[in-house]
């Protein structure tokens, strides 16, 4: 059978990335406590393409991914190595996104319910292996300016804290979720009874924060964590009284701590 992908290409244009995108894939995520949580991930992966090759064999991505059942740096590096060998490439890239549920107790009545967060894993291999993980966590923010100038209440809304990190040691997704939540006005809960709602509302009012405040506070927490070698923080507020959202972002290296 004729191999069209292996035909010689005369245009002599190398391609940086060629691959598949948004493939749904079952995975197991290791829990911080014990056991695994099953999830359905969206996978995108690619390799570089030599200037004399017309195309890649897309089916080979799936063949390599058949060995991917859970998320660890060791497994990711093996998948990338296999892609490089199978595709006769110099560089391979892998990106995975998936929903993850953390179980939380409401602050007063201690009712337990799951909170969905979005998790990201990104890995690349050329000469060296690089690996990043991240989370996107829903939180609750109350506006300091609105509180200061209003006789009654203050506008408040959901916000999302997105954290991406590179680490020298293993770090749990739950650890990043905790960092995001403790630097917001108040965490978000799926299930709240009236005593819980009272607590959350009053706590947010006592702890007002701009998106700028949250981004800076999260960055300072990440700076102090010896496991983390690089980070990027992005905070977006779903503004309740404006016809736009507000955001703030910061990356390691954007500032130098004094003192």
Curated annotation (Swiss-Prot):
May be catalytically important (site feature) positions: 143
Enzyme class: hydrolase
InterPro entries referenced in this protein's UniProt entry, alphabetically: GTP_cyclohydrolase_FolE2, GTP_cyclohydrolase_FolE2/MptA
EC number: 3.5.4.16
Keywords: Hydrolase
Catalytic activity: GTP + H2O = 7,8-dihydroneopterin 3'-triphosphate + formate + H(+)
Functional pathway: Cofactor biosynthesis; 7,8-dihydroneopterin triphosphate biosynthesis; 7,8-dihydroneopterin triphosphate from GTP: step 1/1
Alphabetical GO biological process terms: tetrahydrofolate biosynthetic process
One Pfam family in the UniProt entry: GCHY-1
GO molecular function terms listed in the Swiss-Prot or TrEMBL record: GTP cyclohydrolase I activity
PANTHER family: GTP CYCLOHYDROLASE MPTA
Stated family: Belongs to the GTP cyclohydrolase IV family.
General function of this protein: Converts GTP to 7,8-dihydroneopterin triphosphate.
Annotated protein name in UniProt: GTP cyclohydrolase FolE2
